[in-house]
Amino acid sequence: MSSAAHLSPKPFGRLLTAMVTPFDSDGKVDYAIAGRLARYLVDEGSDGIVVCGTTGESPTLSWSEQHQLLETVKSSVGKAVKVLAGTGSNSTAEAIEATVKAAELGADGALVVVPYYNKPPQEGLEIHFRSIANAAPDLPLMLYNIPGRTGSSIHPATVKRLMNCPNIISYKAASGTTSEVTDLRMQCGSQLAVYSGDDGLLLPMMSVGAVGVVSVASHIVGSRIKAMIDAYSTGQVNIALAYHEQLQPLFRALFATTNPIPVKAALEAIGWQVGSPRRPLSPLKKQMKEDLIDIIKSLRQI
């Protein structure tokens, strides 16, 4: 980790927050809190916000709810940061429709996940992403690889073939390995901006060429994650390492069970009424919540 000179361009900044979706006591989307939360995330250092991704519970949101969330967040933050919409689906036609709609609503980009459950082969993945890119040619796209949730993975060689789509410019790496970043850089060079999809792997991934992170923990410690990124990117590696080590207990606690269950509990603990996750997700267990709160309290004393 001796140098940051090799980092690729960063089209959406370095710190993006995968924002939770707030629900009220009746389980309905609380758009007012969503707007306030988005502004808070900007104040805490986020360069961009991703709405309706994994952390935003997209599987249990209707398309109309997703559209209104995008409009709410975009209106709330204005041009201060980039706002990306999660538009992925395991139906190519549906993903195209969602991506085109996001562009119409003013999104600055779209996060498009590898299709889940139906497990297409690499040829199918190439056709899927190329079709989406061609349907919304003016909207920058971030491919999203998270095989632990989707059941399949896009190969770096497939990504390389997609690089002739001008609007496929970035990639969220959430396979859990730094080698994913290395393999992508070997295939695509610096043309593709790779973001870590795991807070705990942010610094290791930056050391091999990632430009930043799509973060969950930035809901709680955004300014510290931003400081870690800034320290590394300016060659202050020891300072970055100190942040990396200091924040590991929180990073681990936020993924001790299915995301976004812990981060919603963490937000409640610091005063944000974001509600429980929608079913079939369930609230955080009592002991895990107590452990998480202890970690947050200890970080606030540092």
From Swiss-Prot:
Top EC class, one word: lyase
Subcellular location: Cytoplasm
UniProt cross-references to Gene3D superfamilies, sorted A to Z: Aldolase class I (3.20.20.70)
Active-site residues annotated for this sequence: 144 (proton donor/acceptor), 172 (schiff-base intermediate with substrate)
Pathway, per record: Amino-acid biosynthesis; L-lysine biosynthesis via DAP pathway; (S)-tetrahydrodipicolinate from L-aspartate: step 3/4
Keyword tags: Amino-acid biosynthesis, Cytoplasm, Diaminopimelate biosynthesis, Lyase, Lysine biosynthesis, Schiff base
Signal peptide, first to last residue: none
Positions marked as site (Part of a proton relay during catalysis): 54, 117
GO MF: 4-hydroxy-tetrahydrodipicolinate synthase activity
Record field: catalytic activity: L-aspartate 4-semialdehyde + pyruvate = (2S,4S)-4-hydroxy-2,3,4,5-tetrahydrodipicolinate + H2O + H(+)
GO cellular component: cytosol
Keyword Cytoplasm appears in the UniProt entry: yes
Domain of life: Bacteria
Pfam families, alphabetized: DHDPS (PF00701)
Enzyme Commission numbers on file: 4.3.3.7
Amino acids binding pyruvate: 55, 214
InterPro entries xref list: Aldolase_TIM, DapA, DapA-like, Schiff_base-form_aldolases_CS
Gene Ontology BP annotations: diaminopimelate biosynthetic process; lysine biosynthetic process via diaminopimelate
Quaternary structure annotation from Swiss-Prot or TrEMBL: Homotetramer; dimer of dimers.
Role noted for this protein: Catalyzes the condensation of (S)-aspartate-beta-semialdehyde [(S)-ASA] and pyruvate to 4-hydroxy-tetrahydrodipicolinate (HTPA).
HAMAP family named in the record: DapA
Assigned protein family: Belongs to the DapA family.
Name of the protein in its database record: 4-hydroxy-tetrahydrodipicolinate synthase
Record organism: Prochlorococcus marinus (strain MIT 9211)
